[in-house]
């Protein structure tokens, strides 16, 4: 039994180490020294990226784990022979994705995702901007990495697993180990699951991108590849233009109304969920539920015809801070390659010299929120982990 647990543990940590070692290579290839990043930055990238590396290593450990679990009920189980093909496939995927991601980042500026498949139909055009030597060197690197990774994985794998006398107890023990593996893959036991945003830690996009596991980035984006342009196209362009005409301020003359008594105010944005008009008396809602808000409605600008943009936190947040309408079947916040390109209030304020903080009482890794906030101008994030344990557990959804 110890031999089985030792093998699964060794396999998992070997794959994890492969992913961790990829990070400094990725950074060096993409000019980290020229960009002024030092040893501390390399360490930060590897430490913060380890959780997503562990989740991806967990996925790749799932199949060997199932074989080891089954082997308990066999007198002799030829583990290495069965896993030979799987190791070649796993090594090929790890190596190809790493080299392609490393090479394309120089041109794209973002991590490998499902958009790479858009170029498969026209490889000639995709390869037109690089030389034959460029391609051959990277193909050679892929082949060497496949051979090296396969050799390492085969080296740590026992050839045969023999039967254990206590099969029931052994099965129970392995199932417990499987539970640990599931938690690693999921990314913990909190509301958020493993996502790209959990490894973001810096205001430097390059460091955040370096921390992202390319295998996870590619696989997670494949389920989000949709042709949104062909969906929900209810109006022709002429009618759409007529409906939108007048919604935006004109560019002629001075259309700005001065409503503040200072040109550089402190700005506090409070975003509340479930705060519907049914609870606000000035909107025809119940009386005395929001007395202080009722008072504020008389002192400032009160919008009486304002509707929530979506029914989920991630979609409504992006709409509020970036002015990007929520999509019916997808969350832009969960697509970092898109969300990082959106305009945002915090980004504009940062450029104007403001310090931008974001306070959130819940798990800020939920639905990739962390990556969106750091990518759109927020300089400091305060979340549930900044509070005491008692405060963190005071409510299921945060402080």
Over which residues does each language-model region extend?
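Soluble catalytic regions of membrane-associated enzymes that act on cell-envelope
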Residues: 190-399
């Amino acid at each position: 039994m110890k031999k089985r647990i030792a093998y699964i543990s060794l396999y998992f940590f070997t794959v994890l180490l492969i992913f961790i070692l990829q990070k400094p290579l990725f950074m060096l290839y993409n000019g980290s020294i020229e960009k002024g990043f030092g040893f501390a930055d390399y360490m930060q990238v590897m430490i913060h990226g380890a959780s997503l590396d562990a989740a991806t290593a967990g996925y790749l450990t799932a199949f060997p784990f199932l074989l080891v679990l089954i082997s308990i009920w066999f007198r002799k189980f030829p583990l290495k022979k069965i896993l030979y093909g799987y190791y070649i496939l796993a090594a090929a995927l790890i190596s190809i994705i790493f080299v392609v991601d490393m090479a394309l980042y120089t041109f794209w500026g973002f991590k490998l995702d499902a958009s790479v498949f858009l170029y498969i139909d026209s490889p000639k055009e995709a390869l037109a901007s690089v030389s034959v030597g460029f391609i051959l060197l990277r193909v050679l690197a892929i082949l060497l990495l496949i051979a090296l990774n396969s050799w390492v994985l085969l080296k740590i794998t026992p050839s045969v697993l023999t039967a254990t006398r206590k099969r029931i107890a052994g099965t129970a023990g392995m199932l417990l180990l499987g539970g640990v593996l599931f938690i690693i893959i999921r990314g913990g036991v909190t509301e958020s699951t493993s996502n790209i945003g959990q490894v973001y830690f810096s205001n430097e996009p390059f460091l955040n991108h370096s921390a992202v596991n390319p295998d996870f980035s590619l696989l997670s984006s494949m389920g989000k590849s949709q042709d949104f342009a062909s969906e929900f196209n209810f109006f022709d362009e002429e009618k759409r233009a007529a409906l939108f005409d007048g919604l935006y301020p004109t560019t002629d003359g001075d259309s700005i109304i001065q409503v503040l008594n200072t040109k550089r105010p402190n700005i506090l944005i409070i975003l509340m969920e479930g705060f519907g008009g049914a609870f606000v008396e000035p909107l025809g809602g119940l009386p005395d539920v929001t007395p202080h808000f009722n008072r504020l409605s008389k002192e400032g600008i009160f919008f009486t015809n304002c509707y929530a943009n979506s029914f989920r936190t991630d979609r409504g947040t992006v709409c509020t801070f970036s002015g990007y309408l929520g999509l019916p079947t997808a969350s832009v916040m969960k697509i970092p390659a898109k969300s990082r390109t959106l305009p945002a209030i915090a980004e504009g304020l940062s450029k104007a010299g403001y310090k931008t903080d974001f306070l959130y009482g819940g798990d800020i890794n939920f639905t990739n929120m962390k990556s969106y906030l750091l990518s759109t101008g927020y300089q400091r994030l305060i979340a549930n982990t900044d509070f005491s344990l008692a405060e963190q557990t005071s409510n299921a959804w945060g402080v």
